[in-house]
Regions:
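Terminal low-complexity tails and localization/encapsulation signals of metabolic enzymes
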Residues: 1-9, 221, 237-238, 316-374
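N-terminal helix-loop segment corresponding to the beta1-alpha1 unit
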Residues: 1-187, 334, 360, 364-374
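Short, well-structured beta-strand/strand-turn elements
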Residues: 33, 306-321
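Glycine-rich beta-alpha junction loops
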Residues: 40, 124-126, 198-203, 240-242, ...
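Conserved Rossmann-fold dehydrogenase catalytic segment
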Residues: 127, 155-163, 186-202, 221-228, ...
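Flexible glycine/proline-enriched surface loops and loop-helix/loop-strand junctions
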Residues: 156-165, 237-241, 350-352
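Aromatic-enriched alpha-helical interface/lid elements that frame and gate functional surfaces
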Residues: 231-308, 312
Length: 374
């Protein structure tokens, strides 16, 4: 597959979600990705069986890779991996902390032997901290970072974000860091050692509630489908469905009142004449606006919102997403048939990438063992 990273070779000692997210983006960009799997396979292969008997996770984040089974307890297989790494540009791994070092594949040893190699270690908790050795999974990180605490409604208690955001975001952070390391290597000729943790990734995303608590002295509230710092920016109910409406400036607030609600006086109400006041008086604001919307249809209001150029979004089901006007899908070949997946976001020179094939377990064992034979 051609692309910006054509000619780049990646060895991925990976499992589950975070590292495969990083390497599938590298594969989409044209890199050759060799996925090393335990003899029984990456356990994400058995998360579910929704796609022709195959896992949704595995189909999504393992396209364009070569699958090679290795048993790292066997010296011959460990030597095979070492020979692959001798020719690799990038090594991505998310085994348990310390596992690669015990195998002789730690970053210090590898970069001593291969100075141009970029090593990316993905862990649950931050390297060098007391929690680094702990096991960590997506939901645990959502809980530990406070993300679960700020997610949900006032009466719901802490909630999980609806997707595996810790894993997915960490994979993207690793992908970005690897690309930066490739650019640096082009200038210096030297590889890099990258350490990325799920905790650091989500903690970085938590900076707004963190700064609110640290410097504003306020523990952020769970607001459900509402923005904690902007109002009105939340869900309103109509006769035939729900819509999130977003007002981003004082000018838009006046336009909403005058052109959508036909109520210029509301725009001058001293309780609501600045964003700070509107967020402070959010309950009264939402009650006032909801009273204006009661009995009206979504089409009636969205026509006014479109004309006034006020942003909104309908509350969609996943079924709605399947038929959404903005949704793009691409075909992916799997061992059990062609699946349609939602497309990666980048459109380059008017084109979406061509996605590679999802490998069967050990599909490339023979060819890779021959290619990297001693």
């Amino acid at each position: 597959m051609s692309g910006a990273l054509e000619g780049i070779m990646v060895v991925a000692l990976e499992q589950a979600v975070a590292a495969p997210v990083a390497t599938v983006r590298l594969a989409d960009a044209g890199a050759r990705v060799i996925k090393l799997e335990r003899p029984e396979g990456d356990f994400s292969r058995s998360y579910d069986d929704c796609v022709f008997g195959q896992s949704t996770y595995f189909v999504w984040i393992n396209r364009g890779k070569e699958s090679c089974r290795v048993d790292l307890k066997k010296p011959d297989d460990l030597a095979l991996v070492a020979r692959m790494l001798a020719k690799a540009d990038i090594f991505v791994q998310n085994l348990a902390p310390g596992a690669t070092k015990r195998l002789g594949l730690g970053s210090k040893e590898l970069r001593k032997r291969h100075p141009r190699l970029i090593v990316c270690d993905i862990s649950g908790y931050t390297a060098g901290t007391s929690m680094h050795e702990r096991k960590a999974y997506d939901l645990l990180i959502q809980a530990e970072t406070g993300l679960a605490f700020v997610t949900g409604s006032e009466g719901s208690g802490a909630n999980r974000v609806g997707i595996s955001i810790s894993d997915v975001a960490t994979g993207h952070a690793a992908y970005e860091a690897v690309l930066e390391a490739l650019l640096l290597r082009a200038r210096t000729g030297q590889g890099s050692h990258i350490q990325i943790s799920l905790f650091d990734t989500i903690a970085d995303f938590m900076n707004v509630p963190y700064l609110t608590r640290r410097y504003g002295g306020r523990e952020p509230r769970r607001l459900g489908l509402a923005h904690p710092s902007i109002a009105p920016y939340g869900v309103f109910h109509f006769a035939d469905g729900d819509i999130v409406i977003a007002v981003q400036s004082e000018g838009e607030w006046k336009i909403l009142c005058e052109d959508v609600l036909n109520d210029a006086r509301l725009g001058r109400d001293p309780r609501f004449d600045s964003n700070v006041k509107r967020t402070r008086n959010r309950e009264a604001l939402d009650t006032t606006l909801q009273a204006q919307f009661n009995g009206k249809t979504m089409d009636e209001i969205t026509a006014r919102l479109d004309k006034a150029r006020i942003a909104y979004g309908r509350i969609s089901t996943v079924g709605d997403l399947m038929n959404h006007a903005s949704a793009s899908t691409l075909p992916v070949e799997t061992p059990e048939g062609i699946a349609e997946v939602l497309a990666p976001p980048a459109i380059v020179d008017g084109k979406r990438p061509k996605l590679g094939r999802v490998p069967a377990l050990g599909e490339h064992d023979a060819t890779l063992r021959k290619e990297f034979a001693p």
